[in-house]
Amino acid sequence: MARYTGPAWKLSRRLGISLSGTGKELEKRPYAPGPHGPNQRKKLSEYGLQLQEKQKLRHMYGMTERQFRRTFDQAGKMPGKHGENFMILLEARLDNLVYRMGLARTRRAARQLVNHGHIMVDGARVDIPSYRVKPGQTISVREKSSNLVVVKEAIEVNNFVPEYLTFDADKLEATYTRHAERAELPAEINEALIVEFYSR
């Protein structure tokens, strides 16, 4: 399944969750798009709830189904709770951590920064958004890219960096000090439903 590249606001309304992280998509119209508007939402079956939760998380991180399932399977081989491990692996993606650092206003914009070669890990350029960052590694912006308008604008509006990142705004770099804990990850996601979906 290909990565969704359509309007993010429309997908946010369909899934009932803000994919941009701003919440603006749902402020005026907190219902699915289309002619039926607010009357379109209906009670979902157990399978429908599981599928919806899976789609919410997959689109939140901007992944293809193949990437998403592969990460899910990898999480299943780790000790501990499958669902929590899955969330932790998703959070460790390079594009996501660039977003968490505040270098981009959305994960989609962060993915573009990585794709275009603006981001470095431990001093080496990495242009793979799905690159899994390990604790202790440092993420930074290339010197040639430090004056990008999109980066400066993003930093100006960002007022929160999670505790598992130590961010130096002057150097535009952060160290991924540890894996995130479940309490620090999206509370609106019920990962147990996703485990149930793939366990059918």
Swiss-Prot record:
Annotated TM spans: none
Record InterPro entries: Ribosomal_uS4, Ribosomal_uS4_bac-type, Ribosomal_uS4_CS, Ribosomal_uS4_N, S4_RNA-bd, S4_RNA-bd_sf
A Pfam family per the record: S4
Keywords: Ribonucleoprotein, Ribosomal protein, RNA-binding, rRNA-binding
SMART domains: Ribosomal_S4, S4
Assembly mode: Part of the 30S ribosomal subunit. Contacts protein S5. The interaction surface between S4 and S5 is involved in control of translational fidelity.
Name by which UniProt lists this protein: Small ribosomal subunit protein uS4
Organism: Bacillus cereus (strain AH187)
